[in-house]
Amino acid sequence: MSTKYIFVTGGVVSSIGKGIVAASLGRLLKNRGLKVTIQKFDPYINIDPGTMSPYQHGEVFVTDDGAETDLDLGHYERFIDINLNKYSNVTTGKIYSEVLRKERKGEYLGATVQVIPHITDALKDKIKRAARTTDSDVIITEVGGTVGDIESLPFLEALRQMKADVGADNVMYIHTTLLPYLKAAGEMKTKPTQHSVKELRGLGIQPNMLVIRTEQPVGQNIKNKLAQFCDVAPEAVIESLDVEHLYQIPLNLQAQKMDQIVCDHLKLDVPVADMTEWSAMVEKVMNLKKQVHIALVGKYVELPDAYISVVEALKHAGYANNAEVKIDWIDANRVTAENVAELLGSADGIIVPGGFGQRGTEGKIQAIRYAREQDVPMLGICLGMQLTCVEFARHVLELADANSAELNPDTPYPIIDLMRDQIDVEDLGGTLRLGLYPSKLKHGSKAAAAYDHQEVVQRRHRHRYEFNNDFREQFEAAGFVFSGVSPDNRLVEIVEIPENKFFVACQYHPELSSRPNRPEGLYTAFITAAVEKSSER
């Protein structure tokens, strides 16, 4: 069977939910027995989002092979339950860098290097390579931004050319737009969608399907009007209504036969998607019996997208405990020794996620100290793990000026230090310890119990600093347990205090491996402990 290519574009406004639509379609096609992969095209000129501010971009999602990517890849993995790779996120910066590198090597044999064909050919190669490396039946490619953006033009031209390259029966274009509702007029307005499609058609792409984002149900008259003016079949105008839970969306799209229309267009003769297990999960999610309050003490809490995988992993762990997770967003900059009890006193659990830089770290340390001394379940992630060690050094080992060398290079007690292979690294981008690495678990520890007593787990990392092993014996003598280490025993991966209900922190990012139907072990154990604390109130 020829590989099938589905392209998802957006119009009218950005952040319209293209990624969720693409991920939902991927889940439906996977449940039809097709092997699906998915990728995101980001038209910005950065090589990757690794050095971008979370306020600009949100979370950086890390793949198994160490690519720093767009947060939409997290949605893709969670919805479709697949592990993506470096070919799943392509930026303008990455493409231009590769083309210019080839030009410097003389690989274009003296030709004038141009957007067409050199940039568009490089983009098409990324699409085909993503499908080829995963041996997929279907590849879904989402283009970031909106039609009409200057940055998107080479990407859309590459998508247009794909139809001629692989054949019309193997390509489908899906356009996602906003259908605004004017309260004063009491009606929905189709004109923005019409203009968006007109713009897309002006670039040579005729959409085969429209997905309409809306707050209000769309009547058949509106669908017929859009079908007429945008030249698509009325049944191919799909409503994407706002929902209470994201995981309802695949079921809503299936109810409108979206996946069947896609299969018919691409001439895919495959069974109907069996969504029984997914439906049962959604039913459970919408009828959770308990509630638990988790304080998330972070640096970027004004933008929840900066912690989107953390939030989803907490929710998944809540599902496993039949509990709705309510998140209290605590700005780490506000936390002091004087107000920590007031800010965190109502929390059933405290999570301290990753981050970079000095700002907010002292507040996080106060939150960690409160969790340790008051025996509140606590989970530290990445920088949260490093600060857990710093807090213990300061307040238990009484090393008053202990710190991380990242935060204070002159500290007399560098509990956290630069990794040896990072000493001579000058570039910030793409140089962290990235991707999947193993952690050997200590028998009888809470970490081992969280992972069903496995000897080794593999999780994704994104860091440059590590625990300084010169202090390991001193920590262990005071009851601090290093419950996860690298197989060569050089790198500390997980730490815990066994006397507490749940006081565990890890260097890696467990949230990147969580799925709604298969929650991550440490998160599940953390929420279990938080639910128990909640029941004691």
Curated annotation (Swiss-Prot):
ATP binds at residues 15-20, 72. GO terms for biological process: 'de novo' CTP biosynthetic process; pyrimidine nucleobase biosynthetic process. Pathway: Pyrimidine metabolism; CTP biosynthesis via de novo pathway; CTP from UDP: step 2/2. Residues 293-536 form the Glutamine amidotransferase type-1 domain. Pfam families: CTP_synth_N (PF06418), GATase (PF00117). Keywords: ATP-binding, Glutamine amidotransferase, Ligase, Magnesium, Metal-binding, Nucleotide-binding, Pyrimidine biosynthesis. One of its GO terms (molecular function) is glutaminase activity. Catalyzes the ATP-dependent amination of UTP to CTP with either L-glutamine or ammonia as the source of nitrogen. Regulates intracellular CTP levels through interactions with the four ribonucleotide triphosphates. This is CTP synthase. It comes from Streptococcus gordonii (strain Challis / ATCC 35105 / BCRC 15272 / CH1 / DL1 / V288).
